[in-house]
């Protein structure tokens, strides 16, 4: 990172701390990650604003507060193996890869997946496995997972993802069609408990693959 980018990332982490993010490991990862790398050059000057930004193909890079909040929720059971559904720009994956030993991430849009893979390689993050495919179905041959994060809004909770959690595993996702609820769902053997965390706004989780 350049000195200017590092200063901007550190300042962003301070703003997120003031906004209520308490996990110091999450804040450290935010402060060390060059968000401008995950944006087109035309939007790089907005990289450290606490706002969602377009990345093409009708997708967005999430607001940094939401990235930090979802990561904080995901880490509640100290997961070792995590699945991310919706790689997008790769920014959320870059944060997670600094915090968990093993990350698997799925993206249905091929162009975004290729770009994200290149970005994480440039950041020397090598504990990440990438898949081009339908996130609704999860990644069954790499399951079970200690935690799963979905970075797009599902109209209903995907059953396939619930089935791929370990006992005690956590699923963090937005649920709803317009304004959504960010939820944390915990598996207790064959039953599940859920918590509504806060109101959020995400692009929809879409079935299938897109070249």
Curated annotation (Swiss-Prot):
Its EC number is 2.1.1.77. PROSITE patterns: PCMT. This is Protein-L-isoaspartate O-methyltransferase. It comes from the Bacteria. Belongs to the methyltransferase superfamily. L-isoaspartyl/D-aspartyl protein methyltransferase family. One of its GO terms (molecular function) is protein-L-isoaspartate (D-aspartate) O-methyltransferase activity. GO terms for biological process: methylation; protein modification process; protein repair. It is found in: Cytoplasm. The gene is pcm.
